[in-house]
């Protein structure tokens, strides 16, 4: 197998540990790790790291607070915004500003990589950015014929949400931060004719020194008062929020599920059902894994594979991606694409985890 792999990552993170374990299993030398924070401070470190031919994989900054703050402060500068206080741990703050810094960093990285033709990329920076902008990503998938939930466009605040619902004659929608990840800030909103409403989210609304703030928690919160829901939506809308139609997920007993499929080299590989009683079925929210093969009949499995393949073809310069799908009645819709969707410890496909499978794929190429 190809010997040399460099990761732009956070050393010691779960992603790095799983990749190093896969390399050890295949009797490959450990991957070289370039820390995000170091590269952001001194981009020339990348040129040195990639001096010899090999593979290069971009992982997310993860738990590297210094890297996230660097991106946030770069975003402020690029958008002409005044310097901001540092977000507290888990706080949903200035996601759009962070994204501006992240997109600029990826653009700079792409320029650097253009001078290093001997380096083979796992995922191209431009496509990582495209998948991180959730609204643009869904529009991109739809333009390539991939079925997605109907997009209702940006939401500018609570009052605008009410207008949108009335215009489209809807009483329930999903609200998603344009630059969020892992269900952070996603809101399942519904109202009825009697005027009652409910918002369900992993975003926890807290008051700090009298100021409302949002924190991403690994548990679901429910809001039923108009003032709390309006505050929740308004805070998220300031960071760019969009709405999409509510797609019912198939049920299994008292729970419902969607599916994560990892594509490698454009082909569907690892797949897992994400089963939960709550609206959000993300696995990090204490939901359960389920066996996709036992849950899906032949027509649904065919729809899953066809749709995942079509979605992957919309990102031809991404060897690897995770897609979240709702599959029912022989139809599949893509809820989200994730350029970093391979963090599924222990999930096997044809006897290999996601990290071993991607290393083998690169060797075969």
Enumerate the language-model features and the residues they cover:
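Extreme N-terminal starter segment of soluble prokaryotic enzymes
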Residues: 2-6
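Short, flexible loop/turn elements at secondary-structure junctions
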Residues: 9-12, 38, 155, 179, ...
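Conserved N-proximal alpha/beta basic substrate-recognition cap immediately N-terminal to
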Residues: 10-155, 159-163
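PAS/PAS-like sensory domains
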Residues: 23, 241, 318-320
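Protein kinase-like catalytic core scaffold
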Residues: 120, 173, 269-270, 333-336
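Phosphate-binding site of ATP-dependent enzymes
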Residues: 165-282
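Short, surface-exposed charged micro-motifs
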Residues: 260, 322-324
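C-terminal active-site "lid" helix and adjoining low-complexity regulatory extension at the edge
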Residues: 275, 282-320, 327-365
């Amino acid at each position: 197998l190809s010997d040399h792999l460099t990761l732009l990552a956070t050393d010691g993170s779960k992603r790095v540990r799983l990749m190093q374990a896969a390399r050890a299993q295949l009797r490959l030398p450990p991957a070289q790790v370039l820390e995000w924070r170091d590269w952001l401070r001194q981009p020339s470190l990348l040129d040195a790291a990639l001096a010899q031919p090999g593979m290069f994989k971009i992982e997310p900054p993860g738990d590297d607070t210094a890297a996230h703050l660097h991106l946030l402060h770069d975003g402020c500068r690029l958008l002409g915004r005044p310097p901001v206080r540092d977000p507290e741990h888990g706080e949903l703050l200035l996601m759009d500003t962070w994204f501006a810094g992240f997109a600029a960093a990826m653009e700079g990285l792409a320029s650097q990589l253009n001078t290093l033709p001997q380096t083979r990329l796992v995922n191209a920076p431009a496509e990582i950015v495209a998948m991180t902008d959730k609204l643009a990503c869904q529009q991109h998938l739809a333009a390539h014929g991939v079925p997605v939930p109907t997009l209702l466009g940006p939401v500018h605040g609570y009052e605008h949400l009410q207008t949108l619902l009335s215009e489209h004659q809807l009483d329930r929608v999903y609200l998603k931060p344009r630059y969020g990840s892992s269900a952070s800030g996603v809101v399942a909103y519904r109202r009825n004719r009697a005027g009652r409403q409910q918002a369900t989210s992993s975003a926890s609304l807290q008051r700090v020194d009298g100021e409302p703030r949002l924190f991403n928690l690994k548990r679901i919160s429910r809001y039923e008062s108009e003032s709390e829901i309006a505050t929740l939506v308004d805070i998220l809308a300031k960071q760019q929020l969009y709405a999409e139609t509510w797609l019912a997920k198939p049920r299994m007993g008292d729970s419902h599920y969607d599916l994560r499929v990892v594509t490698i080299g454009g082909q569907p590989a690892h797949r897992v059902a994400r089963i939960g009683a709550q609206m959000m079925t993300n696995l990090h929210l204490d939901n359960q894994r389920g066996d996709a093969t036992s849950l899906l009949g032949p027509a649904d499995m065919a729809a899953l594979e066809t749709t995942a393949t079509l979605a992957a073809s919309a990102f031809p310069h991404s060897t690897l991606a995770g897609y979240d799908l709702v599959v029912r009645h022989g139809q599949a819709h893509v809820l989200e694409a994730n350029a970093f969707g391979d963090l599924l410890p222990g999930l096997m496909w044809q006897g290999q985890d996601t990290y071993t499978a991607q290393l083998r794929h690169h060797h075969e190429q």
